[in-house]
Amino acid sequence: MTDIAGDLHNSATVYPERVPAIDRLAPSVRPSQRAVMRQKWRDLLFVHWPIRPEAVRPLVPPQVELDLFDGKAYVGLVPFTMTGVRPVGLPAVPGVSSFHETNVRTYVRLANCDPGVWFFNLEAASAIAVRLARRLFYLPYHYARMFLEHEPTSQANEPTSILYAGTRHWPGPLPASYAIRAQPSGPIQPAASGSLEHFLVERYILFTIRNKLLYQGRVHHTPYPLQPARVLSLDETLLDAAGIDRPETPPLAHFASGVNVDVFPLRRV
């Protein structure tokens, strides 16, 4: 992705938000075409920071616009576990179909539709998944060693905390690692339409670039069973490896126990 950045991202234009013109519920409707993959996403932690639009505009291609909420762009760090990853019609393969994953993202859209995700980088603890995703979905995957641990609590009424950690091995840039300890607590419910939480997590479209051509991918799942979370500790260099200066403001965090996901083929935009 970095070799594209130099000749595609010269414009620093920040586009105004046009939220009223965007249907943010339409992408959650299941696409009519046949899914190509099925997978389960578990123990998702969404960690977000508001950021100045001009700080991330040069890092995304000119074919998309930044998707803003109240005039702010957001960058996210999202670790989770994938299980049951398989092509439609084939069984999952033990030792291959389950692995940890983490992504660094922002939110983009087309001129007045299709609010989606732009991935700066994605880490996966499966070398096979990394190679396939880079080849088939044109996504900037990296192989990383990662682990996720549900930590016991010292008091009966205290919510469980979860430790997410990982270190990138290849390809670069290096170093790139993270260690996040978070504590989910509070009511579990889908994000309300029109809320910041809905804007951040209910994303069913991704965009990616290959040979300067823009592609769009779709996923489908039920709304996340979302829960507030508290970040107890955070040490990471993934944002820096993506060319992003992490904002100094405390992050906004949410947790979801998981959803079952259908993945649809890429198409040219």
Residue ranges and their predicted role:
Residues 2-88, 238-239, 244-269:
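Hydrophobic, proline/glycine-rich low-complexity stretches
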Residues 20-25, 93-105, 148-154:
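Short, surface-exposed, charge-dense and proline/glycine-enriched linear segments
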Residues 44, 103-269:
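Internal, well-folded beta-alpha domain core
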Residues 57, 62, 72, 76, ...:
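Generic preference for flexible, low-structure residues
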Residues 73-124:
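Extended, compositionally biased
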